[in-house]
Amino acid sequence: MADSSDSVSIDMEALSLGGQEHLVETTYGPVCVAVCGDPDKPALITYPDIALNYMFCFQGLLFCPEASSLLLHNFCIYHISPLGHELGAPMISVDAPLLSADDLADQIVEVLNYFGLGAVMCMGVTAGAYILTLFAMKYRQRVLGLILVSPLCQAPSWSEWLCNKVMSNLLYYYGTCGVVKEMLLKRYFSKEVRGNGHVPESDIVQECRRLLSERQSTNVWRFLEAINGRVDLSEGLRKLQCRTLIFIGENSAYHSEAVHMTTKLDRRYGALVEVQGSGSLVSEEQPQAMIIPMEYFLMGYGLYRPTQSVSPRSPLSPTRISPELLSPENMGLKLKPIKTRLAL
């Protein structure tokens, strides 16, 4: 566990999500963690996708009043940034060793130890979802549950590996050029919000494009290399004992990956919710679709909206996933029943 001399605290009150950022020294290098909420509450850690940070991956979700009240009432949120993905991050030295996905998962343990956290709830998007799933498999006693958005769980297909290699080379030699931005935007969003010659880009895509322009391309390249070298987690998924709620956009490039992951999880613990008309970044594109499934999911841990009289400081004792997830109507979502999957 790091001592106080290993952390630099930065006042982030000006940021839209509030909280305070800590630069925590780990065996694998410094990692930026933004802490939002009451540290006496149970911990929720988040991990973003490639080239993004917590503000872009989870801002849309936390700006929904219902989601904000549900999560911030029950949790203290620890937003973990991959190396060099925080705002204003310097370029990582070219002499620094490349980290693997395993290294990034191990780094999370050091972060938890630094803050004195035990078992935590986890929320991740795509590459971040893979890192958190790997973390849950390696350190089962440190994970209460997983909320995954468009997760990866298999090794890259040849087409994905090649696409990532092209993007990796472009990042390394040309920086975050226009082609790289388009590849990443296609990764995150559906065609509807990306726009075309007749329909302008949505505000969230324009904001994301601006964010990508500010990224340190070498830092993004490092995270991409780690994810492109990932291994298949399929065989170990059934041994996961934590509850897992998976969201997948109907138009996500990783739709089949999420379905595959659900089939590999223990049927008692996993649920898949498909959100129609969304790309991979459901938490930004259609965050309101996540609220009711998350609410029922957290009920299994005795966690409720603020109107309930249950203390969020009480120990979490997970039960099975609520049966209400079986019914799209009860979730308030217009989902295709065959694509709304729950295993009890």
Curated annotation (Swiss-Prot):
The keyword Cell membrane does not apply. It is found in: Cytoplasm. One of its GO terms (biological process) is regulation of auxin polar transport. Keywords: Cytoplasm, Growth regulation. InterPro entries: AB_hydrolase_fold, NDRG. SUPFAM superfamilies: alpha/beta-Hydrolases (SSF53474). One of its GO terms (cellular component) is cytoplasm. Its main location: cytoplasm. It comes from the Eukaryota. Involved in a signaling pathway that modulates root auxin transport and auxin gradients. Acts partially by positively regulating the auxin carrier PIN2 and AUX1. Acts, together with GB1 as positive regulator of meristem initiation and branching. GB1 and NDL2 positively regulate basipetal inflorescence auxin transport and modulate MAX2 expression in shoots, which regulates organ and lateral meristem formation by the establishment and maintenance of auxin gradients. Interacts with the heterodimers formed by GB1 and GG1, or GB1 and GG2. Interacts with RGS1. Belongs to the NDRG family. This is Protein NDL2. It comes from Arabidopsis thaliana. The lineage of its organism: Eukaryota, Viridiplantae, Streptophyta, Embryophyta, Tracheophyta. The gene is NDL2.
